[in-house]
UniProtKB/Swiss-Prot annotation:
Protein name per Swiss-Prot or TrEMBL: p53-induced death domain-containing protein 1
GO CC term, one of those recorded: Golgi apparatus
Molecular-function GO term, any one: endopeptidase activity
Composition bias, Polar residues: 901-915
Modified positions (N-acetylalanine) in chain numbering: 2
Organism expressing this protein natively: Mus musculus
Entry keyword set: Acetylation, Apoptosis, Cytoplasm, Hydrolase, Leucine-rich repeat, Nucleus, Phosphoprotein, Repeat
Entry's localization field: Cytoplasm; Nucleus
Region (Disordered): 888-915
PTM annotation, UniProt: Undergoes autoproteolytic processing whose extent either directs cells towards survival or apoptotic pathways. Autoproteolytically cleaved into two main fragments PIDD-N and PIDD-C. PIDD-C can be further processed into PIDD-CC, a processing which is enhanced by DNA damage. The cleavage producing PIDD-C is required for translocation of PIDD1 to the nucleus upon DNA damage and activation of NF-kappa-B. PIDD-CC mediates the interaction with CRADD and the cleavage producing PIDD-CC is required for the activation of CASP2. PIDD-N remains associated with PIDD-C and PIDD-CC after cleavage.
Primary gene name: Pidd1
Region described as UPA domain: 585-721
Length: 915
């Protein structure tokens, strides 16, 4: 084995060490004192606990097999002192050791994340391992590189990933045989200048660190073939990188680069240069046209933003800060400006002078529904809808708005924008993203007026103002897509934009049942102004994957055009003159719409393109219905993407039980659907989202699509269980979805709208549970709240009391009830839990009658007690009451008509949908 290792590449050495993990320690576990013998030249002690004790035992016994060991794996999830004592014995006992793996990561935390080992240093004696060629210290707690490592002059591969290293020592350059070095996922802020002395280094991985500069000495690594600097903070690169003549792979994505050395494109062996997700705005033509360069996610062709002028701190007074609670829906803005945080998490900042007179701002957070949400064919909704009033009010200075949104699952070639309604049209605002914490993202924008606002994920859009002199528009998501406008193409400047949508090749081949089929990215071109141009415009699209301009069969290539305002795709291959290069196809058009290149042996491509386009917009989901274990009358309904079902169920089944999820169904973004309880089971509440006994949903793929409802039955539960069911039915589709798409997707049969049915069981009531709620409980009529915000009546409070159960003491304390009074209620109703809850809730309510903010206090107490399900039900009751009150005063003519919602009438109640 030793003779073979002399000529192995570093990856082969690492692979040999990894193969050692599959061997086991030959041990006789018959009793204490059993001998532990290595298997051949491999000793693997990381697969079982107690590895250090086993190694110490072997070192003390010195069996002959120990002298043959060349591969040692030892877990670092051990006591630090025991680990240090054990490693100190290694140089004296394992003289032929060539590979030493001291990794953490074998243990996992509660959330499944790999845990780091306890290793913080190495004994100095390890430098005596003269044969050591492979050292793996990954997933540990190293803050500095142990001093013995640079003294291992025979080291060929060094793995330091997932540690806490902030720098590497200058002595690292004294490893003359090193060919493989990885230091990913550390905290490196600088690199040693001696790194350039590693003349034999072939692979270097420094990704996921904090590097902002690279020393020019890195250009001395003449043998380097792979260099990974992804996910750092690099703003520029040294020109010496162009001297790495052996370089084949250079990965620089997810940095802050604004420029790159032009010489990189001339490296003789380079096969991939990854520059995605940087800040590159202008690149030489050699880099733009090179087939091995990846440029997605860069603002190519966009103008640099003007740097903000620093404010004069000495003259700027401190801005007032307002923090609104859940019972407030308005605030006052004065000419001095203010910073406001709404109860829903939204933030606003009004600069001084934004208003000339005091203005009262009202806000409301709407649950999304088609009438309130405007989405393009390939857009996804990421937030609820925020309404700010008064609509259309003009500010003297732009107001800053921060909206929380759901982090998108996929960001490749997509961008997050804030969408607003202005002059009866929806527009996207220039948006910056800010990360407060992992998975807590803000979309920030400047708003000149108030209206409706929502956060949308859309394909990357590139826009320019086209002058009569012509222009070149490139896609930052796919730099190979570009549109060339010749001089004289327009008389007046007009706005032109492009979007590029990708389709997975596997889905296409499954749809066409053809293994060789492929398509180019889908290109959408739009403009403001006349529908056609004065001169033809040249469009460049990349050829479908696997197809080159020199080998393609032209009879299999089709250029498709989607007619505006229709759903049909026309094959216009014979109507345009297609020009081909090795990687691209070029053609000229005078109208803008959707364009798509297909390479297939099929002949009727238009119909297939329509199906493929619809497939891009469909989501495969499953429906679940679960009952709370301690309260079967509480039912959770949710629509989940297929790939999230298992993880969600594993989290919910601790508190819920229920049937298996439904079969997979397909839904469009923004599609309505309903849940109807059947066979003796009904919804036990008057809810604004309950229409004709059915719970209304609107599906948005990135939102939760979940509701918790309470159910009841008119059947006798004292005699037996009530076995009912909940069925899910389709509702209306978004307006942009064509009718033929709806028809093609529906089931054939008597009920084409039915999607799934899941069983629901209300268990038999036993003993005193069979008596009706509150049959022996009587109070005077009670109203909490007011007509504007909504009332809670006696029956509403009884319903709330029936939900609380053993959680009522926590709610009572959050409502401000003294602990001694809580104990007295427990004593007076010690055998009656329902009596305890009702007495607590109604005694509090009687004291609050006529006082403002009582209902908001109750909702806040429920949320603080982790009963958000009951808090949402209270909000739903108030919402319904508020709508009824507003409708009644409109019918009697006591109030003027409010400004209507987009897509709804003034008298129409917006149908709530679950975010």
């Amino acid at each position: 084995m030793a003779a073979v290792l002399e000529g192995q590449e570093p990856e082969e050495t690492a692979a040999a060490a990894e193969d050692a993990a599959t061997s086991t320690l030959e041990a006789v576990d018959a009793g204490p004192g059993a001998p532990f013998l290595p298997a051949g030249n491999q000793l693997n002690l990381d697969l079982r606990p107690g590895g250090c004790h086993r190694l110490q035992y072997l070192c003390s016994q010195q069996p002959p097999q120990l002298l043959q060991v060349e591969f040692l794996r030892l877990s670092t999830h051990e006591d630090p002192q025991l680990l240090d004592d054990t490693l100190a014995k290694v140089p004296w006992s394992l003289l032929r050791l060539r590979s030493l793996v001291l990794k953490g990561g074998q243990s996992r935390g509660a959330l499944g994340a790999c845990l780091h080992g306890t290793l913080t240093t190495l004994p100095a004696g390890l430098s005596d391992l003269a044969c050591l060629a492979h050292l793996d210290l990954s997933f540990n707690r190293l803050e500095t590189l142990p001093t013995c490592v640079p003294e291992l002059h025979g080291l060929d591969a060094l793995l330091l990933s997932h540690n806490h290293l902030s720098e590497l020592p200058e002595a690292l350059g004294a490893l003359p045989a090193l060919t493989f070095l990885t230091v990913t996922h550390n905290r490196l802020e600088r690199l040693p200048l001696t790194l350039g002395s590693l003349s034999t280094l072939q692979r270097l991985d420094l990704s996921e660190n904090l590097l902002d500069t690279i020393p020019s000495e890195i250009g001395n690594l003449r043998s380097l073939s792979e260099l990974n600097l992804a996910s750092n903070r690099l703003q520029s690169l040294p020109a010496s990188l162009a001297g790495l003549r052996s370089l084949r792979l250079l990965v620089l994505h997810s940095n802050l680069l604004t420029s790159v050395p032009t010489g990189l494109v001339h490296l003789p062996l380079i096969t991939r240069l990854d520059l995605r997700d940087n800040r590159l705005r202008d690149l030489p033509a050699e880099l733009l046209d090179a087939p091995f360069v990846r440029l997605q996610g860069n603002p190519l062709g966009e103008a640099s933003p003007a740097p903000p002028s620093p404010p004069d701190i000495s003259q700027v007074p401190e801005m007032p800060r307002l923090l609104l609670t859940s019972d407030l829906d308005s605030f006052l803005v004065t000419p001095h400006g203010c910073s406001v945080t709404l109860a829903c998490g939204v933030r606003l900042q009004f600069p001084a002078g934004a208003t000339t007179t005091p203005v009262t701002i009202h806000y409301r957070l709407w649950l999304p529904e088609p009438g309130l949400v405007s989405l393009g064919p390939h857009d996804f909704l990421l937030s609820s809808v925020l309404e700010l009033q008064p609509h259309g009010v003009a500010f003297q200075q732009d107001v800053s708005l921060w909206l929380l949104f759901v982090p998108p699952r996929v960001r490749r070639c997509r961008e997050v924008v804030v969408r607003t309604r202005s002059n009866n049209t929806w527009n996207d605002l220039e948006t910056q993203l800010e990360e407060e914490a992992p998975k807590r993202l803000w979309a920030r924008c400047q708003v000149p007026h108030f209206s409706w606002f929502l956060v949308v994920l859309r394909p990357v859009s590139n826009t320019c103002l086209l002058p009569p002199e012509g222009a070149l528009l490139c896609s930052s998501g796919h730099p190979g897509v570009r549109v060339t406008f010749p001089p004289g193409v327009t008389e007046e400047p007009r706005q032109v934009s492009m979007q590029v949508v990708h389709m997975a090749g596997l889905e296409l081949r499954t749809l066409l049942e053809e293994s060789e089929a492929s398509v180019s990215p889908l290109l959408c071109l739009s403009q403001s102004g006349p529908p056609s141009f004065l001169q033809p415009v040249t469009v460049q699209l990349p050829l479908p994957p696997g197809v080159t301009g020199f080998s393609l069969d032209r009879s299999h290539l089709h250029l498709l055009y989607r007619t505006p305002l229709t759903t049909t795709w026309d094959d216009i291959t014979t109507q345009v003159a297609l020009e081909f290069t090795h990687l691209y196809a070029r053609f000229q058009v005078t109208h803008f719409s959707w364009y798509w290149l297909w390479y297939t042996t099929k002949t009727c491509v238009g119909g297939l393109a329509r199906k493929a386009w619809e497939r891009l917009r469909l989501h495969r989901v499953n429906l679940i219905a679960l009952q709370r274990r301690r309260d079967p009358e509480q039912v959770l309904l949710q629509c989940l993407p297929r790939n999230k079902v298992d993880a969600t169920l594993s989290r919910l089944l601790v508190r819920y039980r229920g049937p298996e999820p439904s079969e997979t169904v397909e839904m469009f973004e923004g599609e309505k659907f309903f849940a109807a309880f059947e066979r003796g089971i009904d919804v036990d509440a008057d809810r604004p989202d309950c229409v004709d006994g059915r719970i209304c949903f609107v599906f948005y793929s990135h939102l939760k699509n979940v509701k918790e409802v309470y159910i009841t039955t008119a059947l006798d539960r004292e005699a037996q269980d009530v076995r009912g069911q909940v069925s899910f039915y389709r509702g209306s589709l978004p307006v942009e979805v064509p009718a033929e798409a709806e028809a093609a997707r529906q089931r054939k049969g008597t009920d084409a709208l039915w999607m799934a049915t899941l069983p629901i069981k209300l268990p038999r009531l036993r003993g005193a549970q069979g008596s009706g709620q509150g049959t022996d409980f009587s109070l005077m009529p009670l109203n909490l709240g007011d007509a504007e915000t909504g009332f809670l009546t006696q029956s509403n409070l009884l319903s709330v009391a029936s939900r609380l159960g053993p959680d009522w003491p926590a709610v009572a304390l959050h409502l401000g009830m003294p602990y001694h009074k809580l104990q007295r209620i427990r004593h007076e109703f010690r055998d009656d839990l329902d009596g305890q809850v009702r007495h607590m809730l109604f005694s509090w309510a009687e004291r609050q009658t006529g006082q403002p903010g009582a209902v908001g206090h109750l909702v806040q107490a429920l949320e603080q007690s982790d009963r958000r399900d009951v808090a949402e039900e209270v909000r739903a009751i108030l919402e319904l009451g508020r709508h009824k009150y507003q409708d009644s005063i409109r019918r009697t003519g006591l109030a003027p008509e409010d400004s209507t919602l987009p897509g709804t009438s003034a008298s129409q109640t917006p149908e709530s949908a679950q975010a």
